[in-house]
Every structure is written in C-alpha cells, then in structure tokens.
C-alpha cells in the first residue's frame, strides 16, 4: 500500500488540475493559434508559466483506487494488476475468469 501522504497529494493535484483546466486550455489555444500576434502568444506563454506546476494534468498519477499502488494499474478497472488478479481469482469481477486451453 502506498503512503497516505502520496495518495492525498495526488488527490490534491486532481483538484488543482480541475481548478485551472479552463484557464490552461484558453492559454494553450492562444499559443497554438497561428493568427494570434506574437505579443499575444508571448503573453500566453508567460501566463502558462505563472500557473502552478500541479495545474498540469501530466503530474497526476494513475493509482490503484483501493490501495494507491502507483504502477501496473489497469485504467479500465482502476485497480492494479496485483489487486486485479486477486479479485479475479475470488470471483469479485463479473465476467472475468482465468483462461485455460
């Protein structure tokens, strides 16, 4: 299980990303726009740099929803491969069964 502080920090990052998402999208749109003046693009670049680091969605880590394991997570299920295997063997995941041939 991951440290509770790491899980809490990741949840805090998700909130910050959500808070600044609209502003980031607006600034990035200005940066990519070829019709925008160089001054406007420079201003957008500086505005993007002034946002908090944690406002970038790339800093959010995909973690296991149950124990917070940071690696080997299945996005479709939201759990780690280890947890997935255990739950599948116990029959807790409907429609998932061990293959044999």
Swiss-Prot record:
Please provide the record's keywords in A-Z order: Ribonucleoprotein, Ribosomal protein, RNA-binding, rRNA-binding
SUPFAM superfamilies, alphabetized: Glucocorticoid receptor-like (DNA-binding domain)
Q: Per UniProt, what is the name of the gene that codes for the protein in this document?
A: rpsN
Q: How does it assemble?
A: Part of the 30S ribosomal subunit. Contacts proteins S3 and S10.
Q: Which GO terms describe its biological process?
A: translation
Q: What is this protein called?
A: Small ribosomal subunit protein uS14
Q: Which GO terms describe its molecular function?
A: rRNA binding; structural constituent of ribosome
Its Gene Ontology cellular component terms are: small ribosomal subunit
Question: What's this chain's function?
Answer: Binds 16S rRNA, required for the assembly of 30S particles and may also be responsible for determining the conformation of the 16S rRNA at the A site.
Name the species this protein comes from: Kocuria rhizophila (strain ATCC 9341 / DSM 348 / NBRC 103217 / DC2201)
Q: Which family does it belong to?
A: Belongs to the universal ribosomal protein uS14 family.
Please name the HAMAP family in this protein's record.
Answer: Ribosomal_uS14_1 (MF_00537)
TM spans (from-to): none
- Which residues, if any, are the signal sequence? none
